[in-house]
């Protein structure tokens, strides 16, 4: 039995799609030195190669892929988008605007200089910025721009070609810039990170390990009574000195939860909760006493929960003002927009921030009720909310504005992005509404993007040979310029106009480029995770601006003549 693989793939779009995805994902795992190709470029390269052999795919799959991707981008950005946009993110908003705006202007200028069409120009912008939201926004706007037939087909093919030719150079050049640009400016990044650490009282241990608190019990003997010297627990300040917290006391056979006015007495059995190293810092009077193995005293359900910040008495306040330790709770992590932040007492909390807190289940629940709600650990997605907001996004995308002879449609990309932002924002404010597990959201977003990349690659592959010979070297030069020049402009603006701390500035610049590998290099150079504060500040807003840039470049292009 002979099987013609080419006929089999041509006759089955679904099989072809998953073959492209599988081969592309394998290719994406390859590394060039320290740089991994990545899933997007792997799938795009494989689809371009198969497209040259005249394989094609149904465009409906391509459209669904980009819709799912851009909607999920909005859902991720939603919890923090409005707080950054309206309140404490002026510098971050301005940096993201400068980065994206300068790249857009430079790309338009180079496109006109080299005589390209809008497809190549928009694709070059998307690839140079390593930004699939630009590609998605531009592709959707092209389909609603009034182009038809072969003109639209050529523009879409050139869009994916420009992206493919410049993506890798955009990624590599940004990583090189992240490695060497901090060394070319006069302020040492590590010194800048230490400076802001001193100002804000940050933990300078960037590799801090997170342990679950443990509970141990001791009997109060003469040494401990003498050490306490009649002071109550508040005056002793055991937590301030060691990091341990007295959770329970058994006195005369009766279990009680002590308050700050309690005084240790001879024969008391006390249960202390704290991290292992905190127990090691206890006064010898504790350790020299008799350790007690009292099942009831030690029977405490230590839990670790993720608390979403929501309530007005927590939003806008500094982390230290929550006084978690006064309530017997221990903070493990602070997460903003899926990015782990330094545990900084002076970090101002935004609505939607996630605090990972450990402690007695009852105490953690009390703290959660005070500042927000415990994140649902269900693995069930609220598909009704997902579908409803997806429909709303599509309906918003159908809106068209007419100005004399010029009409402008919102488009699916902008509509779905806005609907996703609203779903994410509402989820951050209402714990039982619109829940989507992060793993499910990541899977849908990644799958949608890969389907979209496979579609554009197969569509563009047939003409890549001719186009590459005509514009190849121009694309590489333009890609390098659009990748690096906005970074330099953004640095000068942030350093000399906004006068930002350099560690925060470089983190914010990488966030404006939504490039995690470059962010890791900045953190390594600074030997600190302080740049993550800046990265989180610009990341959410940049994703939105990059999508709009893809739309704007298509709208602006005809007016440039």
Swiss-Prot record:
Q: Which Pfam families match?
A: Asp-Al_Ex, TrkA_C
Q: Name one GO molecular function term.
A: monoatomic cation transmembrane transporter activity
- By its UniProt entry, which InterPro entries does this protein fall under? AAE_transporter, RCK_C, RCK_C_sf, Transp_YbjL_put, YidE_YbjL
Which GO terms of the cellular component aspect does the record hold? plasma membrane
Q: Which domain of life is it from?
A: Bacteria
> Where does the record place it?
Cell membrane
Q: Which residues cross the membrane?
A: 8-28, 32-52, 66-86, 94-114, 158-178, 383-403, 406-426, 447-467, 475-495, 540-560
Instruction: State the family named in the UniProt similarity comment for this chain.
Output: Belongs to the AAE transporter (TC 2.A.81) family. YbjL subfamily.
The entry's protein name is: Putative transport protein Ent638_1362
Its ancestry begins with: Bacteria, Pseudomonadati, Pseudomonadota, Gammaproteobacteria, Enterobacterales
